[in-house]
Amino acid sequence: MGKIIGIDLGTTNSCVAVMQGSQPTVIENSEGNRTTPSVVGFTKTGDRLVGQAAKRQAITNPKNTIFSIKRFMGRRFDEVGEEKKMAPYELINDSGEARVKINDKVYSPQEISAMVLQKMKQTAEDFLGEKVTEAVITVPAYFNDAQRQATKDAGRIAGLEVKRIINEPTAAALAYGLDKKNASEKVAVFDLGGGTFDISILELGEGVFEVKSTDGDTHLGGDDFDQKIIDYIAEEFKKQEGIDLRKDAITLQRLKEAAEKAKIELSSRSDTEINLPFITATQEGPKHLVINLTRAKFEAISADLFNKVLDPCRRAVKNAKIEMREIDEVVLVGGSTRIPKIQALVKEFFGKEPNKSVNPDEVVAIGAAIQGGVLKGDVTDVLLLDVTPLSLGIETLGGVMTKLIEANTTIPTKKQEVFSTASDNQTSVEVHVLQGERPMAADNKTLGRFHLGDIPPAPRGIPQVEVIFDIDANGILHVSAKDKATGKEQSIRIEASSKLSDAEINKMKDDAKQHADEDKKRKEEIDIKNSADALIFSTEKQLTELGEKIPTDKKSALEGSLDKLRDAYKNGTTESIKSAMDDLNSQWNSIASDLYQSGAGAAQAQPEAPQNSGSSQSSGGDGAVNAEYEVINDDKK
């Protein structure tokens, strides 16, 4: 059997490594470099270039040169508005999917990524002198289910069996801690790359690498800092000459390369000159762009980006349930951590000098290679325990999201819960699978939907539908639903057809905090309506069963209170619903007392209305939750 290689498939650059004996080795590519630009170019003659060769010709061939494709992996066209503006190449809407159009041919992001992976695969094969068919590929910790699946698909297109998808900060921790297996440390991995930011808190000890929490922003990286410089120099030139350089693809590509170069230079210098001769021309002649950019100015125009790294850090430390002083090391990963302001922010936030002992460009690939060695059996006494970054659940009564798996749960994991129907004689249920942190289903991301049919007709709350969530070691979700009475089962593997945008996934947690009061109020309104609905249902049922035993005057008053609650339920406020419920319950208390004294069905007289029937209260026994499912009328088919 051949080697399992480790690949860091980055937004800006990619890297490949392999275990050689007990040590990981980063492999140089055919140009003699240890990292390869994640760039693919298509020439006018039809040749395909990957890596440095593609990057070199980008200025003269911007519309046919693809970079930062990782930002489009596993995403729909309507989710990539901002990224689309930054790309000089053509992005099209292909049946809702974001695709790249080159010379009248359409490519999926997975296909473009596969071309980069093929370059990594060939690099490893040249080094090892043997065919490579298996790999461990890294992804940002905050990549969602669709993006992870898209990464696996890219590997498959490249001719690789992806043995494991591993989170980038976790891979970095593996590389950092491989020679410290007997030590016990709490480590924060601060990973700021070309397109994404992750922060993970891990506990290392006796060969166990346990992720305690992870957070991040999948729309924050070196590309965004480059864009700040592009916008700054373009606006300065526009002030001087009245021309917006960003409207021409070739000029925009020149600006991008100049911005990236300036950013890198400002990591070691206090200022840099951006000099682009013959950047454009007017009737007066050629125009040249010459702008001096200081580090202070760069930090000022990028202030909002620098500030964005702090909130994920705060959440990660809080969710890890540790004190800041307990963190022993802060390991910097990703090329963007070379920015002095980032290093200063990390030092200020964590109260200690960041650890720069690992190569930020190579450490993730090294960690992936180590994981490959673990899977192969070449590396022993290492156990990796990772987590899922966002909560997973289903929609239940009233549009509430009921979580089955909480964020930062160790994976692989399997959770199940029993739900029930929301209507009498309901013969089919729809399971609406969600990912996110907001209380309401509509505010979270739909991962998929599927139906379970042929449920025997029964009063609502009686059928028992067991929903099972199963996350594998790659962080990919499998969901199934089973009717416990008939044993009939339906399942779904959440595929890459349902995707989150890079901005959305981080926005979920931010919104959960910013709109906490609004969410709480909306959830209370739903809970009250659910309770009112249950009280109406049980009152109607018991009126039918006990009608003749209830005194006429009290029955009339009860029916009046019931009508009042029905009206409040349809048209009233939360307060009016509460008032009507109190009135109806008061009527029942009086009737229950009379029935008890007469011995006529006192045990049945008081209907029990669940207080939170939309999320966790029982209706029908066996801990079943009233779930809002779509009723399918089979007669209309």
Swiss-Prot record:
SUPFAM superfamilies xrefs: Actin-like ATPase domain, Heat shock protein 70kD (HSP70), C-terminal subdomain, Heat shock protein 70kD (HSP70), peptide-binding domain
Domain of life from the UniProt record: Bacteria
Region of interest (Disordered), residue spans: 503-525, 598-637
Factors inducing expression: By stress conditions e.g. heat shock.
Residues recorded as bearing Phosphothreonine in the entry: 196
UniProt keywords, alphabetically: ATP-binding, Chaperone, Nucleotide-binding, Phosphoprotein, Stress response
Compositional bias annotation for Low complexity: 598-619
Key word Chaperone present: yes
An annotated Gene Ontology molecular function: unfolded protein binding
InterPro entries noted in UniProt: ATPase_NBD, Chaperone_DnaK, Heat_shock_70_CS, HSP70_C_sf, HSP70_peptide-bd_sf, Hsp_70_fam
Family, per entry: Belongs to the heat shock protein 70 family.
Functional summary from the UniProt entry: Acts as a chaperone.
Name listed for the protein in its UniProt record: Chaperone protein DnaK
Organism: Chlorobium chlorochromatii (strain CaD3)
Lineage of source species: Bacteria, Pseudomonadati, Chlorobiota, Chlorobiia, Chlorobiales
